[in-house]
């Protein structure tokens, strides 16, 4: 069983804990967050998107009691001071969003006694970026100490792109993610460096940059430089959708494309990670879906023989958090 510490108990930190509950291969033993234990307990127990946690949660002095298990809570601003070693932490989930550079994230290992770090965001100079089901087999404990789980959008894009590339070959393409608003945005207009990002999140469709297509090259090297794209933040709290348009190496039909997705979703390394649906569903139907990417088969289009457009739904919090759990367990099995 791998013992995990969470640095940053925000949306992803709390989703990760919920996803990990009851998993016999993983135990959360410590949390570091600047917020007091009472507030952390309340936000874990009562979630506006996930509902009430179906397990008892209590706050104690310097700890949380979750489903009968004690989780020690630290409150260190500097990661170098977090006593992970004392808590017996093997793997740290770096979920603050602030320490995404390798040098900063590695402090959990070099100064604090953890064995590995998983960054819950795109990393900078990280040892390896992993998208489960796509390139998880590349993890090598002899080489990889600071590992990134990529972004929720990279996890939504990569499985679909891999299937298309393996089956038909991708020449180049464009991606847009119609993305739920996040905590980086504000309820009302306020000064920001990004003047579009300065606007009220719930009142507009807000164009944003997205590094998901560029990051895809770190996960599928043969697609490096072949995709680019952006994001449109929209007034929904969760669930996003990747719109991917690619030029393939050969002519195809929509049915061929959908058959490839059905097959990949049913068996092999993408089973349970990639999904496929022919139902006429909307974003709210995918809230709480643990898969990384669900192909909307009704929306697959082909024009000119080899230009293809597909849509892939993803719960940008819950699906991503489940992959964090999977990655921590995988790293423990392969060696820390």
Give names to the regions the model predicted.
Residues 1-198, 302, 326, 334-335:
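N-terminal Rossmann-like NAD(P) cofactor-binding subdomain of oxidoreductases
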Residues 7, 11, 35-38, 87, ...:
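Conserved active-site and cofactor/substrate-binding residues in soluble primary-metabolism enzymes
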Residues 64, 130-132, 146, 187-188, ...:
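Short clusters of hydrophobic/aromatic residues that line enzyme substrate/ligand-binding pockets
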Residues 71-73, 227, 310:
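Generic structural signal for residues in well-ordered beta-strands
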Residues 96, 112, 168, 220-221, ...:
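A broad structural signal for alpha-helix termini and local helix breaks/kinks
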Residues 128, 203, 242:
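Small-molecule pocket liners
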Residues 166-237:
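Acidic, glycine-rich segments within the central catalytic cores of soluble metabolic enzymes
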Residues 229, 241, 245-336:
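C-terminal active-site/capping subdomain that shapes the small-molecule cofactor and substrate pocket
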């Amino acid at each position: 069983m791998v013992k995990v510490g969470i640095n940053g108990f925000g949306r992803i930190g709390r989703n990760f804990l919920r996803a990990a509950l009851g998993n016999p291969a993983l135990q959360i033993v410590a949390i570091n967050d600047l917020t007091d234990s009472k507030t952390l307990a309340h936000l874990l127990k009562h979630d506006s998107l996930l509902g009430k946690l179906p397990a008892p949660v209590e706050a104690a002095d310097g700890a949380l009691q979750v489903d009968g298990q004690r989780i020690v809570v630290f409150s260190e601003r500097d990661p170098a001071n977090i006593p992970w070693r004392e808590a017996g932490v093997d793997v740290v989930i770096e979920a603050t969003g602030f320490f995404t550079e390798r040098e900063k994230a590695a402090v959990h290992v070099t100064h604090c006694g953890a064995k590995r770090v998983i960054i819950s965001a795109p990393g900078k100079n990280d040892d390896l970026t992993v998208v489960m089901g796509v390139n998880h087999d590349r993890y090598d404990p002899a080489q990889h100490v600071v590992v990134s789980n990529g972004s929720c959008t990279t996890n939504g894009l990569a499985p679909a792109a891999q299937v298309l590339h393996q089956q038909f070959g991708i020449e180049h393409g464009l991606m847009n993610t119609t993305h739920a608003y996040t905590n980086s945005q504000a309820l009302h207009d306020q000064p920001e460096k990004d003047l579009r990002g300065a606007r009220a999140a719930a009142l507009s469709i807000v164009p944003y940059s997205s590094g998901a297509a560029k990051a895809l090259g770190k996960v599928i090297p043969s697609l490096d430089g072949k995709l680019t794209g952006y994001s449109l933040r929209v007034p929904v709290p969760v669930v996003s959708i990747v719109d991917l348009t690619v030029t393939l190496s050969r002519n195809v039909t929509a049915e061929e494309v959908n058959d490839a997705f059905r097959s990949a979703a049913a068996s092999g390394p993408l089973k349970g990670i990639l999904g496929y649906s022919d139902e006429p569903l909307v974003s709210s139907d995918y809230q709480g879906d643990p898969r990384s990417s669900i192909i909307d088969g009704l929306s697959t289009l082909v024009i000119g023989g080899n230009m293809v457009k597909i849509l892939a739904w993803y719960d940008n919090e819950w699906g991503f958090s489940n992959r964090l759990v999977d990655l921590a367990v995988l790293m423990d099995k392969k060696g820390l």
